[in-house]
């Protein structure tokens, strides 16, 4: 696939902002620069968890602040059923999974080239931010869904 066939990610993803208003979800997760979720180490004693964001299986979470993260962007794909994350995180999902597989997109996010791109496109002085608008402007090859499935299957066969 040549560069001209790269597509704008923003045409395939949408933001999600569901809050834990009823405080039903208690599992609090963080996102590491290894691109996985981890149990939060934050001291939450006395913290009002109702403003935290609820995430569900198949959704992505990333930390827009790219400062002090080892030149990597912290992003992960949720594999569990439900959890909450900090309100400072950005949550999004693939709008139509018949056009773009979340697992295929996560493969793209794991590439060192994506980390370099995100750092280059981050802006700010004390805190550099890779905001939602920049995420939407990411361009990547999006082959037909069957080819995506094959690519993901090959990747998983190698990495397992």
What does each model-found stretch correspond to?
Residues 7-60:
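Sequence-specific dsDNA recognition surfaces
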Residues 76, 121-124:
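Short amphipathic beta-strand starts and helix->beta connectors
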Residues 1-20, 137-160:
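Non-catalytic DNA-recognition/assembly elements of restriction-modification systems
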Residues 57, 61-112:
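A short beta-sheet element
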Residues 114-117:
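Periplasmic-binding protein-like
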Residues 83-88, 123-149:
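A short glycine-rich beta-alpha junction/loop motif
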């Amino acid at each position: 696939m040549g560069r001209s066939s790269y597509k704008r990610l923003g045409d395939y993803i949408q933001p999600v902002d569901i809050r834990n208003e009823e405080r039903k979800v208690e599992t609090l997760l963080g996102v590491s620069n290894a691109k996985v979720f981890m149990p939060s180490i934050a001291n939450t004693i006395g913290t009002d968890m109702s403003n935290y964001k609820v995430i569900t299986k198949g959704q992505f979470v990333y930390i827009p602040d790219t400062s002090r993260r080892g030149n990597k962007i912290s992003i992960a794909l949720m594999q569990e059923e439900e959890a909450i994350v900090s309100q400072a995180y950005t949550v999004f999902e693939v709008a139509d999974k018949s056009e773009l597989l979340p697992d295929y997109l996560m493969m793209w996010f794991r590439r060192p080239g994506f980390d370099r791109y995100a750092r280059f496109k981050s802006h700010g002085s004390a805190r550099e931010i890779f905001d939602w608008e920049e995420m939407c402007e990411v361009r990547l090859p999006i082959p037909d869904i069957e080819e995506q499935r094959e690519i993901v299957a090959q990747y998983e066969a190698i990495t397992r």
